[in-house]
Amino acid sequence: MKRNIYLFLLFLISNYALGQIEPGFALVNDKDGYVNVRENPSIHSKVIKRLNNKELIYVYDEEGQKENWLFADNDGYIYRDRIKWVHSFDSVKKTGESENSISFAGNNISITITSQKFDKRKHNIKYKDSYVYLIDGREPKGIDGYLPTDEYKDFDITIDGKKTIIPKDAYSDLFEPTAWYVKVYYDKENDTVYIVASIGDGAGAREVCWQIEKGVYKRRKTGIPF
């Protein structure tokens, strides 16, 4: 009797764990070299687009997760075993943190990210019905209609002794950076670094991932963590 109860509880826990999907970034990883994104969580559902291997996506945590299906990029569904999570790669160790900076080092990688106070005199701000809707011509992320208090200042990155440049437009529309929530991952097989950060809070919250391949900045992806 006790054994049956134990097995039943184990079954429930396993099903619960399998059903829980934490929001986060992932890479398309399919033996066919691509994955189909479907309108609904069914193999018979309409294919709305195709994503190639190594494409960076954001998986949402919401009721749309169905059995072995994931809701990706707020567009459609992909099969759960067709991706590789960014957080599954090796972590690069955090080596320092202050109020406005955070540093990481390891695997011949050195990263320091700094922030600064937002100075509205240095920006072109557009309002709509008293809400901020454009900063320097771009839709701001990390805020919900109010003026930001902090912004990114610089990304100082060295990989294998060479500087990696992160262009300003890869972070100039991101506000309210959170120094204590930044993680760095390294995919050794593909020599790719991923910097994952959270910005803002409440309705303005965003998650961001910068992808650096073989020492060269490739792309940025953002997602809404709710």
Which positions does each model-derived feature cover?
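Surface-exposed beta-loop interaction hotspot
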Residues: 80-137
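Structural motif
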Residues: 204-208
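Sec/Tat signal peptide C-region and signal peptidase I cleavage site
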Residues: 15-19
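Short beta-strand elements that form the blades of beta-propeller/WD-repeat-like
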Residues: 110-112, 191-198
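SH3/SH3-like (including bacterial SH3b) beta-barrel domains
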Residues: 39-53
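Mature extracytoplasmic domains of secretory-pathway proteins
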Residues: 131-183
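Sec-dependent N-terminal signal peptides
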Residues: 4-13
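SH3/SH3-like beta-barrel superfamily modules
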Residues: 21-26, 49-82
